[in-house]
């Protein structure tokens, strides 16, 4: 009988102890789940908060930076001193100013140059064409000054004064047949001609005294004419040769 009485008591005690635990477990699970959801919401909201903090710069600061870039649009690379000055004006850090210029040179500067009519692509092409034209003109002027003399280059050469005999179409005498003229040519002193680099390339005026003396040649011509006249007169006087 004692064993049977103790048996039910022992079987009821675990039920009484376990029943309160089972009734409290759903509330604990709900609180844990709500805490986890709240933590997840904070984690998801954290990047948005950071994005708002590190978003666009103030409009006033951007206007100051844009004005500086437009003023220096042909050399939009501020020095360290200029970055420090812009940082003080815009209340931004040096890193923010540097990053803004890096992005602005790729996104804002090309449109700014096109609006001003200074397209960097067109300007680069025009510079190449002008350089090529200058090289062609330089190459074309070199043969005219230092190239060999040909039929095409004769017209560009300056006209030098010709001796009196060549201008009249007479043939110059042979140096061996006129020894007196040969001696006269040796006796003449050498003349130095000065050229000026700054003034146009033109010869100095030469006096008639500096030309070669053709008096001996004129004497030979007169003697030949006189001899021909004598022969003609002899033929007329002697009808029967």
UniProtKB/Swiss-Prot annotation:
The keyword Transcription regulation applies. SUPFAM superfamilies: Homeodomain-like. It holds the Pfam family Homeobox_KN. Keywords: DNA-binding, Homeobox, Nucleus, Transcription, Transcription regulation. SMART domains: HOX. Residues 21-36 have a biased composition (Polar residues). Gene3D superfamilies: Homeodomain-like. Signal peptide: none annotated. GO terms for biological process: regulation of DNA-templated transcription. Its main location: nucleus. PROSITE patterns: HOMEOBOX_2. Belongs to the TALE/TGIF homeobox family. This is Homeobox protein TGIF2LX. The gene is TGIF2LX.
